[in-house]
Amino acid sequence: MRRFLLLYATQRGQAKAIAEEISEQALSHGFSADLHCVSESEKYDLKTETGPLVMVVSTTGTGDPPDTARKFVKEIHNKTLPTDFFAHLWYGLLGLGDSEYTYFCNGGKVIDKRLQELGAQHFYDTGHADDCVGLELVVEPWIDGLWPALTKHFKSLGGQEDMSDSDTLAQASDAPLSMAMKPELLHIQSQVELLSLEDVGKRDSELQEQNETNKNQPSRIEDFDSSLVNSVPPLSQSSLSIPAVSPEYLEVYLQESLGQDENQASVPPSVDPIFQVPISKAVELTTNDAIKTTLLLELDISKVEFSHQPGDSFNVICPNSGSEVEDLLQRLQLADKQAHRVILKIKMDTKKKGASLPQHVPEGSSLQFIFTWCLEIRAVPKKAFLRALSDYTSDATEKRRLQELCSKQGAADYNRFIRDASVCLLDLLLTFPSCQPPLNLLLEHLPKLQPRPYSCASSSLLHPDKLHFVFNIVELPSNTTAASLRKGVCTGWLATLVAPFLQPNTEVLTADHSDALAPEILISPRATNSFHLPDDLSAPIIMVGPGTGVAPFVGFLQHREKLQEQHPDGNFGAMWLFFGCRHKDRDYLFREELRHFLKTGVLTHLKVSFSRDAAPEEEEEAPAKYVQDNLQHHSQQVARTLLQENGYIYVCGDAKNMAKDVHDALVEIISKEAGVDKLEAMKTLATLKQEKRYLQDIWS
């Protein structure tokens, strides 16, 4: 068996799932994948590795490698390593990213570049998969091309590797096809099953007959346009190439609960310390007629060891919506068993390599707890999940549609009706009523419910033992009922939690409602980042934060104000804030507080943009619609701050549009004011980022 080392670096499980898919496909191509997380350094050794290396690397934050790869990246960036340290190593790398972020696929690019600097060579070209348009558009063909690339690599080494009898038989059965085709076309033997309506085999013969019958009957769908449940030609008449079904590997037993005192998990598992803290204050920062509702919450951290500084972020551990969990269990016909304990075991005869129990499902927890606190039931189902669901769908039309949505031919429909529409499992089960998946399938495919990150919006110097954060209540259209809106998993939960004592925005600075009933939430620290005030207090800084992106900068300003009080003779650099919102009178967050900082001189320049109002007349506000416009209105000062005064620029907020537009504006500013072309301006920004003088805290 031809062995290769397969490493993944994952943040939320995406890279791991893709690596597992590669591992499962490897056997059918005569390869053996030695699969490990890159953090499991005790299980592999690149210094002595003789086989080819395949890596799948995701990206997190603002272009950083995932947390699981931090140690690995640090080790390979040791400056004492010689340039031929990995000269023996041949590798192929698949990077995952999102082009909505400035530093697309940077986690993979960092590792790729460093491996080459240390002498490693590609046996297969690097792939960059974009979650913005659909990872599968690159992932699937990259995996398809991996097998001929590995085959070519092993042939170039000469000789045949040892194989077991079963492996030899497997290869022999493939020999006619292999010999009849060029090596670069061998990927046709990959994991896909060619499901032709003319040649589907005995198991699907009844479905084929039903499909033929359905063609001659009136459609039960009024809308003849393509939709989640309905396809149109040519897709509806095409033969389909669909993924091979992933081997099931879990056995699930439901054990009747012995009573409420029975020992079970009360907190979802986490590698980070978890703190239970009360919400001491909740303030609505926007007016009732604002397009988005923004809340400020204050946490009382006086009883826990939770240190933080302005610019830090932290995680809120949140549950799924109780009503959604109830609806899902009802649809799965498990509502009467929601208090039962879930016992998991690995199937004795599973074909899944390296099968293990999901670490995010605590042993002996109730069914309701698992679906409420452990599983991301809002996750958009991947194609492998759709493929598995199709096997448990009895209606021929519904089964065919699920197969279309996970097929190569149905990629456009998948993106439009599943991915872009943020369809979740409950949506699918309500749309395809004959789909009756077993519980083990859901536990195998639903990912871990992730904590939600929030920026600290306060300074411990001004608010000791308190922690502020700000968020918009996210509203999403529901795919199950046309008129309803779903709230964000975490923001909707928090809004409901604080509704009984939510205060209007009268005076954020001094209002205190700690005497109200204080619900408690779970929080955990996040890995430290560099989004902090510079150590050199005399360095000028530019802060760009529209909407809730202003949150960390309020903490910056609070911190700076207290430092100036403590050091009245200190040399403090200028502070610019570029803030933006829709309406001056509806969603101008922290308006009075920002004006206070401007009046006291802590904030040197406040430039505010109102995208939906007529041009403002007040002196501190420039007539620009967006923060990037305001930056360009002050291009000379911005360029001087960054290029001549060794200043810092911080950008916080939406990655999809704002962060890109701000980046483009900075390129134009540097190009114009420094008299260089745009390529040189981009290099200058890259240098600023490397020097940690251009810092981003952005989200999608």
From Swiss-Prot:
Catalyses which reaction(s): 2 methylcob(III)alamin-[methionine synthase] + 2 S-adenosyl-L-homocysteine + NADP(+) + H(+) = 2 cob(II)alamin-[methionine synthase] + 2 S-adenosyl-L-methionine + NADPH; 2 cob(II)alamin + A + 2 H2O + 2 H(+) = 2 aquacob(III)alamin + AH2
Residues reported to bind FAD: R452, P453, Y454, S455, G488, V489, C490, T491, W699
Amino-acid positions noted as binding NADP(+) in the UniProt annotation, renumbered to this chain: K292, S611, R612, Y626, V627, Q628, D661
Record keywords: Amino-acid biosynthesis, Cytoplasm, FAD, Flavoprotein, FMN, Methionine biosynthesis, NADP, Oxidoreductase, Phosphoprotein, S-adenosyl-L-methionine
Lineage: superkingdom: Eukaryota
GO biological process, one term: folic acid metabolic process
Domain Flavodoxin-like as annotated: residue spans: 4-147
Stored Pfam families: FAD_binding_1 (PF00667), Flavodoxin_1 (PF00258), NAD_binding_1 (PF00175)
Record SUPFAM superfamilies: Ferredoxin reductase-like, C-terminal NADP-linked domain (SSF52343), Flavoproteins (SSF52218), Riboflavin synthase domain-like (SSF63380)
EC number(s) per entry: 1.16.1.8
Domain named FAD-binding FR-type: residues: 272-534
Disulfide-bonded cysteines: none
Cofactor: FAD; FMN
A GO term for molecular function: oxidoreductase activity, acting on metal ions, NAD or NADP as acceptor
Subcellular location(s) of the protein: Cytoplasm
Binding positions for FMN per the UniProt entry: 10-14, 93-124
One Gene Ontology cellular component: cytosol
CDD domains assigned to the protein according to its UniProt record, in alphabetical order: methionine_synthase_red (cd06203)
Class of this enzyme: oxidoreductase
Segments of this protein annotated with the region Hinge: 168-247
Residues the record lists as Phosphoserine modifications: S173, S190
Biological function: Key enzyme in methionine and folate homeostasis responsible for the reactivation of methionine synthase (MTR/MS) activity by catalyzing the reductive methylation of MTR-bound cob(II)alamin. Cobalamin (vitamin B12) forms a complex with MTR to serve as an intermediary in methyl transfer reactions that cycles between MTR-bound methylcob(III)alamin and MTR bound-cob(I)alamin forms, and occasional oxidative escape of the cob(I)alamin intermediate during the catalytic cycle leads to the inactive cob(II)alamin species.
Subunit structure: Forms a multiprotein complex with MMACHC, MMADHC and MTR.
Protein name stated in the entry: Methionine synthase reductase
